[in-house]
Amino acid sequence: IFRWIWRRMSDAKRIKLEGRERPVIVTHSGTFHADEALAVHLLTKLPALADAELVRTRDPAEIAKGTVVVDVGAEYSPSAHRYDHHQRGFFETFDAEHKTKLSSAGLVWKHFGKDILAAHMQCADSDERIPTLYRKMYDDFVEAIDGHDNGIPLYPGISDPPAYRSRTDLSSRISFMNPRWNETWDDAD
């Protein structure tokens, strides 16, 4: 029965502090990128990691001490909370419908996104809104970070449709500040 319960627990509920007073999130040192910056930010939205210490290193001994490790260590192992995407043979995608290879941000969202939403919305992770928001957040935000970090062009060929949505560019940000076509607005604004 324990295995049955364990398999049904979310990844966020499996985080163990292993005698530590404070959890540790580890990522690589040096130049930072959007994928691990987002991955770390998302992880700190989980109650178990809200006050986590951030360690930036490439030292294997320090990496091994991490409660959760993202974007470093050449290991993808959800059961050990290791979320790197740089190793050979890694081709994990969000689900069967998506083709974009996940970055550390996508891996964190895939494994913790529903728990992050539930914590943010202060609702049960079984709330009926969670699956829709989980998918929408990936499609409209996280996937573009995955694509960019993995060097996947938005337009693979001249006549190809976009490989993923990119709604975080400057034009999109400005567009989001304008009223929608069906909203009333005052031209003086």
Model-predicted regions and their roles:
Residues 182-189:
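Hydrophobic helix-and-loop "lid/oligomerization" segment in the mid-to-C-terminal part
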